[in-house]
Amino acid sequence: MVGKARSSNFTLSEKLDLLNLVKPYVKILEEHTNKNSVIVEKNRCWDVIAVNYNAIGVDRPPRTAQGLRSLYKRLKEYAKQELLQQKEAQSEFKSSVSEPTKQVMEMIPQIASFGLIRDRSHIQSANLDETAQAGTSSLQVMVDHHPVAITVEVKQEEDIKPSPPLVSNPQLSDTLEQREEHELMHVVEGSESPSLSSVDMRMTSSPSSVPRRDEIFHQESGEHFRSLLRCDPQVLQMLKEEHQIILENQKNFGLYVQEKRDGLRRRQRLEEELLRAKIEVEKLKATRLRRDLPEYSSL
């Protein structure tokens, strides 16, 4: 693994200690924005994490905040790769993944949805292949029962393997079958000549009269898949949490600006009071000086 090779200079206990130290600040560190206040807050968090990490054990080499940040990114990337491999192997990933990956999944639940979305795309493509094969067989049966003797040859690509039995979309399949039936009836009605050779010649010379099923599927399956992603409860929950974090950050930034303004006002008042006090002191000094002079003392 690329992530494992890069972080080989860190032991397993060091990785787990880093994840335990990052856990209280994960909400701030996982906020992806370019706001200056958020960037400053992230840097402050990493400085605190580096100080706490170096204070754990004296036998470990000291680590900088930038080095710990790079290790944290590599651990997240390694967790994604490991989950994807476990998904492809169809094994119980919760019992076979490494301990750092388990902690990353507990801290960032969105990591687990990375493999789910990937699997959903594979299942959707398999559904489309199965529906295409079912539509091809229905087209051949419909031509066999037609009274006009028309030979239609449908060639499938040799490198396509039959997909496993999955749940197909019946509404999409019915719509496509109706379209093909309409196109086929249009071709048959347009050829009323008794000569069968002319019909065969028209069918063989213009293969584009009946649209390819894969082109129709590419057009309609994209919209269907995007609508599935938009309605995914995990994606909606992630968007909701992100929106709440943005609102909370805006609220905190507003409080910070208000406190800064109040502090500037208090500082200005204190400076004015100090200036007035200095003026009073100077007046008292001048009065005392006049009293000490001989010409004023005689008066």
From Swiss-Prot:
UniProt GO cellular component terms: nucleoplasm
Subunit structure: Interacts with APBA1 (via PDZ 1 and 2 domains).
Polar residues compositional bias, start-end: 192-209
Subcellular location, record wording: Nucleus
Position(s), cross-link Glycyl lysine isopeptide (Lys-Gly) (interchain with G-Cter in SUMO2): 94
This protein's record includes keyword Transcription regulation: yes
Protein name per its UniProtKB record: Fibrinogen silencer-binding protein
Main location: nucleus
Record-linked PANTHER family: FIBRINOGEN SILENCER-BINDING PROTEIN (PTHR15386:SF0)
Protein purpose: Transcriptional repressor that down-regulates the expression of the fibrinogen gamma chain. Represses transcription of GSK3B gene promoter via its interaction with APBA1.
Keywords: Isopeptide bond, Nucleus, Repressor, Transcription, Transcription regulation, Ubl conjugation
Pfam families in the record: Myb_DNA-bind_5
Species whose genome carries this gene: Mus musculus (Mouse)
Region annotation Disordered: where it falls in the sequence: 189-211
Top-rank taxon, per record: Eukaryota
UniProt-recorded Gene Ontology molecular function terms: identical protein binding
Keyword Transcription regulation included in the entry's annotation: yes
